[in-house]
Amino acid sequence: IGSCISLYEDELIFSSNMRNENLPDEFNRYDFDIYSVDLKKNKKIAVSISRLNSVNNDLSGSLYYDGSKLMYSKFNNDNFDIYESLRKDNNWTVGKRKMGDELRGPNTENDEFFTSYDPPEVKVYFITNGGYSGNKDIYFSGVKNKERNIWGGAQSAGIEINTNYDEGSVYIHPDGKTMYFSSKGHDSMGGYDIFVSEIDELGQWGKPVNLGYPINTIYDDNYFVMTADGRTAYFSSNRPSGNGGYDIYKMKYKGDKKLMLSQSEDKLFSEIKPIASLKKENVAKESLKLLTIFRGKVLDKVSLKPVEAEIKIIDNSSEN
């Protein structure tokens, strides 16, 4: 569950309660740990990210678009809170930094998990059971002081998004205006379904649209994430065609409007042994709108302080 992918689909991070080094509970169930898969390799092997895992449940949340940091949730003191780990020298740091403290930010005495970054990096979206409905809802918090790690109080994503039923996951696409989320409400076929909503000029999320079959079924379909080019996505489902519990499925975008599963319904088996190889299918050639994230600072040569600047980007491979 909790699939996270890098911008160009070279890494997959997820959580699983597969057999691990910790002891199972009285029902022979193992705690959730966080794993990483290098999608560039032919053999898809799930590797435990040991610095993030504990004897309690650890849930992956959101991999930043450039792969430089990861939000995840840890179970401590009877509730889940949000943590962040940074990637340094291709290794993850111990997630010591919480996204806010107490009621100043996302982390409260309630559960906060299954997070999502937004591209400007001024908000954190997450699932919480601390909303007004008493169910799991989608909330967000805005940063007030990034250096001091102070975040504003949690706010609901809006009445168009949250329902009287549970919302299960949220993902903000790199375009910054598209939200994919799961819900048992709206016009769900049954259990969790995956929906899409777009934000308007006033910053309000619009009426959600059900992605439809075969993505959604009468079973639970959840934890949807998509690549930057909008052509490939991963999600989890407990449909009968899987191996029991939640399995991770990969799908291809085929056509202008609808997201379609590949006919073979390639799934990533949540096991410690090599994950099943993904089949590369031929996709019809059509023009794609590619997204490039450009980040950096312009500094004064003497003072080394940030200065205002105008940057021009020229594509030598085209006439634009």
What function would you assign to each model-found segment?
Residues 310-320:
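Short amphipathic beta-strand segments in non-cytosolic proteins
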Residues 1-297, 302-307:
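Short, conserved micro-motifs composed of acidic
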